[in-house]
């Protein structure tokens, strides 16, 4: 039974009394302080001892002496170990070294630690152990804890921005009858009662757009998605996305909102707009906007504008880059492959890339001026994709045709191709207003703003190999 109820936190005590001098503390005679925390440091010196307690907010020193507590309790205290969770009560004073300290008048053991702390509490330095035993990492590395505090603030800032703009937060299914909403390989599970396969969602897109059909004009969701792909410093099989849809808006409005969300997130954790990420200097004030085809020509001087419509020329060029090709690819897929190979990694400052080929944008509306391209954008920062958005395809016949193309690709062995979603086509036949949707990777945004090079460092419990 828990009988100790702390009234104070370490950070609070430092904030309230950290500026008071030794004389001020004596004059104010601040009694009734009580705090609970883990012993992270201790120095036993006969009849008096010092220890450092760590709670969820920070550290504070305590001073325990036989003069203030029962001798038997003090003798017990001398046998307590690093890692034990204790509760103390007392008054505040400053030591000769000017450290704010609790002079203990009462203390009790709350939880006994049966295992020793790693590295004598200097921190868990083995990277693999930090991920597998995150509780020890959080316990010993204040920098790790700060990352996840910042992550929470970043998510909160994004949610606040969407609510401020009148969006409705919703929750859509995590298990789907069909794999759709993005081009990726899904996880498959079986529902025993229904006797059928279900797929962990790779994106919430098709359900969120059903809500547009139903009459919600502004919706968003912050939640997990799953992709059955490789593990790396950039990818985890489950990850957090914020995806939103707005009817009757423009792609440019949503580009501007995406930028606003990112800058607001940086502000929420007091992050400078000029940052270092993975040894790259990035200026968050320097957003630019360029067409994908223009970027391909800029970074591939051997290609000219005519080559962009020449399948054989693009295939030859891609093979020259040492990349494998597929006979089922059209010019759009070749163009995207060349972009990913030669351009993507060079987009260091924030860059919105627009006008993707329709062939690789199965859910995007065609550009009315150039139908082989879609009204779509992706945001790249530090050579990595952060967001993907487009004017939503609301023509059921065009969408059905693209689903058929995806189904053909799947039959030809493309494990990432989407299924034909008949129910979604029926929804579109009821009429979906013109809309723009955007997906923003939360994990990658946290990596950027906290200067972490691995996605595992911004996930509390990342997926690891055995």
Where are these regions (language model features)?
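Class II aminoacyl-tRNA synthetase catalytic cores and aaRS-like
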Residues: 1-466
